[in-house]
Amino acid sequence: MKVAIIGTGNMASGLANTLAGAKHEVTLGSRDPGKASALAEKIGLGVRGGGITAAAKLAGVVILAIPFGAAADALKEAGDLAGKVLVDISNPISADYKSLLIGHTTSAAEKIQALAPKAKVVKAFNTIFAQLLPAEARQGKSLQVFVASNDEAAKAEVSALAQSIGFDALDAGPLSNSRFIEPIGEMNIHFGYFLGKGTVVAPAWVAV
Ligand SMILES: NC(=O)c1ccc[n+]([C@@H]2O[C@H](COP(=O)([O-])OP(=O)(O)OC[C@H]3O[C@@H](n4cnc5c(N)ncnc54)[C@H](OP(=O)(O)O)[C@@H]3O)[C@@H](O)[C@H]2O)c1
């Protein structure tokens, strides 16, 4: 798949590495194009880097790997996303990581859909710590990625993307279910940072 990743931080770098390793065509986009080019060069594996507009233009799937609060600016820079799959991986949390800033009647994913009404927004990966993106860090364990969207084809595409890098994609229903998935991400952060488990844990839905 042709994937644009907006951002050059922990998630952007981990996703770019893993996705490119699985033979996806990855372009990093940053508000500082030089930073994206430098990261792309460091990763290798055919990853390219540049500005946000150029990266988004080349791709069918655009992953926003930036803080939720930066989404409006980045989407403005991304330009026309009509018909593209837009993946929201964010946890809309406070600066101290301890609480969610959005919830109950909406979610970060729904806000992003409102900002990019012609894109097909998919919520995914918000419950996976960056440290667990490299396959070797998962030590053979199959971790679940909860995937929510109002567009079934987009959901299938992002599920295939997650599966191609060794995750178990779980259909989590419509985009409005992000109201429930984002609190799970926040609970995971509490386990990872405040309850002593470290950033090597991930939630899973278990059937008996
Ligand atoms: N880290 C995790 O384990 C984890 C797990 C699940 C989900 N998430 C979510 O993934 C997203 C990224 O997290 P991260 O840990 O990778 O963050 P990070 O390492 O702090 O990187 C954030 C990136 O966002 C960019 N950015 C910030 N403001 C921007 C703006 N106004 N316009 C364009 N780009 C902007 C930064 O660019 P500059 O370098 O130019 O400042 C940087 O590349 C967040 O929404 C987070 O909630 C993170």
Question: What is each residue range found by the language model?
Answer:
Residues 143-208:
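Active-site-lining helix/loop region of Rossmann-like oxidoreductase modules
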Residues 44-96:
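Rossmann-like NAD(P)-binding element
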